[in-house]
């Protein structure tokens, strides 16, 4: 089965966005990315951090999740076309391999792993992968409706979800000390040494269980995986990007999504702003996919698109390499630049 090149190019593009989003985590920590004002950055780097947060954080990982579901179905279709026996079993083996790699990545390389949750989602989806397109269409619609209701409910909850200034300052000081000067063992066990105020807030709602947190992460991403499968079964990427309801509408909504994502910077931080920001991030992801599809259909032979395509074909390798490079730049067992005022220079170097 012929590869869908626009999907490969989009995957490469999403990897760049993911690296820029993860750059904040590499440099400031999982919750520290939201407290960059406590790192005393110069005005230019601080502004770059805010822009990365609005445009890339929680906007490009959903694209990667959609493409993961898309690729999973394409792989299944390819095996069926080639009359390969027990294709679901082969998908199951691949998911176990990805799960193992995800565990190793999370334990020995970087705590911000996404491979583990992707592998678990794949295990859940395998029994249904042979179902018709209508199944995935309605699962996706119902999934997004449930998520919307979940976060719309937060609009009526004005509870403050922002940790205190003292909690933020303490967290920033402790993680900087460990990531910039601690041993490899201390970095790998930082969750046992430092209380992440953002994670503590989530634990209050979901309970002190990492398994439950992982399942919640899979739940909020599940409609993205099924949307990707729907895109595959409907040949969505091959269709004209000028169609209004399936593409152009979401491009027009990109500015609205950006305003929604920026709400945390011009409004009080509470459950309602968290909900608006999350839903806006998902909307922005779909808008970016549609915009990229439109640009690709007009400039598919452009050298940028071709290079993104090659990057997308090596997405797993590129993702692991990003983690290795990011930790070696910022953690103490590398250059130890965690928390330093160099955000703009690293972003510029990567984009080059």
Regions found by a protein language model. Give the residues of each.
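N-terminal signal-anchor module of multipass membrane proteins
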Residues: 1-66
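Functional transmembrane helices that form membrane-embedded active or gating regions
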Residues: 3-9, 249-254, 296-325, 343-345
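Alpha-helical transmembrane segments and terminal signal-anchor/GPI-anchor hydrophobic tails
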Residues: 248-296
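Conserved small/polar residues in nucleotide/adenosyl-binding loops
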Residues: 349-350
């Amino acid at each position: 089965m012929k590869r869908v090149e626009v999907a490969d190019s989009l995957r490469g593009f999403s990897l760049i966005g993911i690296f820029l989003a993860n750059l904040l985590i590499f440099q400031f920590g999982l919750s520290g990315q939201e407290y960059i004002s406590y790192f005393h950055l110069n005005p230019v780097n601080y502004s770059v951090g805010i822009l990365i947060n609005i445009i890339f954080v929680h906007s490009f990982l959903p694209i990667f999740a959609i493409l993961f579901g898309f690729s999973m179905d394409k792989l299944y279709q390819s095996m069926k076309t080639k009359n390969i026996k027990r294709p679901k079993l082969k998908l199951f083996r691949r998911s176990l391999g990805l799960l193992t790699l995800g565990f190793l990545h999370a334990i020995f390389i970087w705590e911000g792993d996404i491979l583990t949750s992707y592998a678990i989602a794949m295990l859940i989806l395998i029994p249904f992968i042979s179902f018709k397109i209508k199944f995935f269409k309605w699962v996706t619609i119902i999934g997004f409706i449930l998520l919307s209701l979940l976060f719309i409910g937060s609009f009526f909850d004005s509870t403050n979800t922002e940790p205190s200034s003292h909690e933020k300052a303490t967290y920033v000081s402790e993680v900087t000390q460990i990531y910039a000067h601690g041993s490899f063992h201390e970095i790998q066990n930082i969750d046992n040494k430092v209380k992440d105020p953002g994670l503590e807030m989530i634990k209050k709602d979901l309970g002190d269980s990492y398994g439950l947190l992982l399942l919640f992460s899979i739940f909020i991403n599940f409609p993205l995986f099924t949307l990707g499968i729907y895109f595959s079964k409907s040949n969505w990427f091959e269709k004209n990007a000028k169609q209004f309801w399936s593409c152009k509408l979401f491009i027009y909504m990109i500015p609205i999504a950006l305003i929604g994502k920026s709400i945390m910077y011009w409004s009080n931080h509470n459950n309602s702003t968290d909900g608006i920001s999350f839903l806006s991030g998902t909307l922005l992801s779909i808008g970016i996919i549609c915009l990229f599809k439109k640009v690709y259909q007009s400039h598919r032979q452009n050298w940028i698109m071709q290079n993104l395509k090659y990057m997308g074909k090596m997405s797993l390798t590129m993702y692991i390499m990003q983690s290795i490079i990011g930790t070696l730049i910022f953690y103490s067992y590398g250059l130890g630049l965690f928390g330093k005022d160099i955000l703009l220079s690293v972003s510029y170097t990567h984009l080059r």
